[in-house]
Amino acid sequence: MSGKFIVIEGLEGAGKSSAIASVVTHLQAKGIQVETVREPGGTPLAESLRDLVKKKWEEKVSPTTELLLMYASRVQLVDNIIKPALSKNRWVIGDRHDLSSRAYQGGGRELGDELLQKIRKITLGNFTPDLTLLLDVEEKKGLERARERGELDRIEEEDLAFFQRTRQRYLNIAAKDPSIIVIDANQSMLDVHQSILRAIEEYLF
């Protein structure tokens, strides 16, 4: 079986980490070789860029600067880790991909989807995930979960309106793209994981 690239998306506190662990266990039980990656990050250089993005700076970080750092990290990961793994027929499970930038920078930062699409075309070309699972959680609930984990980073400290714009952009894009499956992440963890595994079975097997 050829390699597949599955991405788990969602706001802070949506439950991406536990969902990824569930997907990995499910696929490995089928005898599939699986690699996991995260964005931003995933290579030494990309992890350094992640630190720059999340750090709390004394100066204002331009939304465009933030966006370009995200894509620099993303290209490094795709070219050095994801594409080589797929070429070896391994499955890659990603904690975020460029849908995050379209939602967070395009929606939350209000840069607009036209700019995001142009940058995506320049940096990634026609490379896209085989399936994206969007864990949709109510903004307040997601932020409460994130705060319970500990100290928030620069982006996690944004106000509620930022996350409302981000969530709405996620849902608007998903409504027009059949490769993005929306999962209700307000359910119990067990129900969320079952919904995810059903979607994977339906769309990729």
From Swiss-Prot:
Q: What is its EC number?
A: 2.7.4.9
Cytoplasm keyword on record: no
A molecular function (GO) term: ATP binding
Question: Which keywords belong to this entry?
Answer: ATP-binding, Kinase, Nucleotide biosynthesis, Nucleotide-binding, Transferase
Its cellular-component GO annotations read: cytosol
Q: Catalytic activity, per the record? A: dTMP + ATP = dTDP + ADP
- Please indicate if the UniProt record lists Nucleotide-binding as a keyword: yes
Q: Name one Pfam family in it.
A: Thymidylate_kin
What InterPro entries does UniProt report for this protein, alphabetically? P-loop_NTPase, Thymidylate_kin-like_dom, Thymidylate_kin_CS, Thymidylate_kinase
Offer one example of a GO biological process linked to this entry: dTDP biosynthetic process
User: Top-level EC class, please?
Assistant: transferase
According to the UniProt entry, where is the signal peptide? Answer: none
Q: What PROSITE patterns does its record include?
A: THYMIDYLATE_KINASE (PS01331)
The positions annotated for binding ATP are G10, L11, E12, G13, A14, G15, K16, S17
Function of the molecule: Phosphorylation of dTMP to form dTDP in both de novo and salvage pathways of dTTP synthesis.
Q: Which NCBIfam families match?
A: DTMP_kinase
Instruction: Describe the family membership recorded for this protein in Swiss-Prot or TrEMBL.
Output: Belongs to the thymidylate kinase family.
State the name under which the record lists this protein. Thymidylate kinase
Q: Which organism is it from?
A: Idiomarina loihiensis (strain ATCC BAA-735 / DSM 15497 / L2-TR)
Native organism taxonomy = Bacteria, Pseudomonadati, Pseudomonadota, Gammaproteobacteria, Alteromonadales
Gene name linked to the record: tmk
